[in-house]
From Swiss-Prot:
Protein name: tRNA-cytidine(32) 2-sulfurtransferase
The organism's place on the tree of life at top rank: Bacteria
Pfam families: ATP_bind_3
Motif (PP-loop motif): 58-63
Keywords: 4Fe-4S, ATP-binding, Cytoplasm, Iron, Iron-sulfur, Magnesium, Metal-binding, Nucleotide-binding, RNA-binding, Transferase, tRNA processing, tRNA-binding
Annotated metabolic or biological route of this protein: tRNA modification
Function in brief: Catalyzes the ATP-dependent 2-thiolation of cytidine in position 32 of tRNA, to form 2-thiocytidine (s(2)C32). The sulfur atoms are provided by the cysteine/cysteine desulfurase (IscS) system.
Family, as annotated: Belongs to the TtcA family.
Organism: Dinoroseobacter shibae (strain DSM 16493 / NCIMB 14021 / DFL 12)
Protein's gene: ttcA
Classification via NCBIfam families: PRK10696.1
Length: 287
């Protein structure tokens, strides 16, 4: 099905190799799986009314992969939503402002490009030597929510992949003292927008190979001169080491996030240990 000649312009540069065809099918399959498993398509779509999704496009490999996968599914009638790509130009020095609008126009993708100088705010508020990422992210998120409302979108879609989710889990474990990560679907604090991560089951390495193979115009993520905090770098290095020593370890750890047994943890808010009876211990369906 994915090898038809009738393809979206986003795939016009697709290599004809067996390796790329397998990569493409795997990514599309993983995205469909996440959309279905986590109920990302709203009830309105299932009843015949198309919701509108704001797909955030930074110009990095992950957001290009997200846009291409969603557009592929929509193109083939497998995703009953309207897609609006959105790039928020935050005023970072050296940001190539024409790259994304020209690319999206050429690809025929509906889009909105907005300039908001959050960079100056971040530079003014964050002390020298500290990472800018947290404040920058909050300001970006607020603007994206506003744009989604203005465009009549019901959901904001982000390009976080499987490895982002794993790294966040371990950062919360090591530094926050809690078991939590980025969920594939949540409702914002105001209660009026979904936040969706359809790449939740996609490996970062697959995103990198995919975007490179299609020769998408990648924009560096460190134009502001800041990098992710040291904690995330350390966690990423740790996961890389585990994966090198035991190939497939990342996928096993990710599977654990989908296979939680509250009765075998220690949180009384999730499992009623005090009310546990002897008969419950031999239940065929332990919680």
């Amino acid at each position: 099905m994915l090898d038809d000649a009738d393809i979206h312009p986003l795939f016009h540069n697709a290599p004809g190799t067996t390796e790329f065809k397998k990569l493409r099918k795997r990514i599309i399959r993983n995205v469909r799986e996440a959309i279905d498993l986590y109920g990302m398509v709203e009830r309105e779509a299932r009843e015949g009314t198309k919701p509108r999704w704001l797909v955030c496009l930074s110009g990095g490999k992950d957001s290009y992969t997200l846009l291409a996968a969603l557009t592929e599914l929509q193109w083939r009638g497998l995703l009953p939503v309207e897609i609006l790509a959105c790039n928020l130009d935050q005023g970072q020095p050296g940001f190539p402002a024409t790259v994304l609008p020209e690319f999206l126009e050429r690809m025929g993708v509906p889009h909105r490009i907005e300039y908001q100088d959050t960079y100056s705010i971040v530079m003014d508020k964050v002390p020298a030597g500290r990472t800018y990422c947290a404040l920058c992210s909050r300001l970006r998120r607020g603007n994206l929510y506003r744009i989604a409302r203005e465009e009549g979108c019901s959901a904001v879609l982000l390009g976080h992949h499987r490895d982002d989710i794993l790294e966040t889990f371990f950062m919360n474990l090591f530094h926050g003292g809690r078991l939590a990560t980025m969920p594939p679907k949540l409702v914002n604090e105001e209660g009026d927008l979904f936040v969706l991560r359809p790449l939740a089951h996609v490996a970062e390495a697959d995103c990198a190979r995919f975007a490179k193979a299609l020769d998408y115009p990648i924009i560096p993520c460190d134009l502001c001169g800041s990098q992710d905090g040291l904690q995330r770098q350390q966690v990423k290095a740790l996961l890389d080491g585990w994966e090198a020593n035991s190939p497939g370890r990342r996928q096993v750890m990710f599977k654990a996030l989908t296979n939680i047994r509250p009765s075998h943890m220690l949180d009384p808010n999730l499992f009623d240990f005090a009310g546990l009876g002897l008969a419950d211990a031999f239940s065929e369906n332990p919680k």
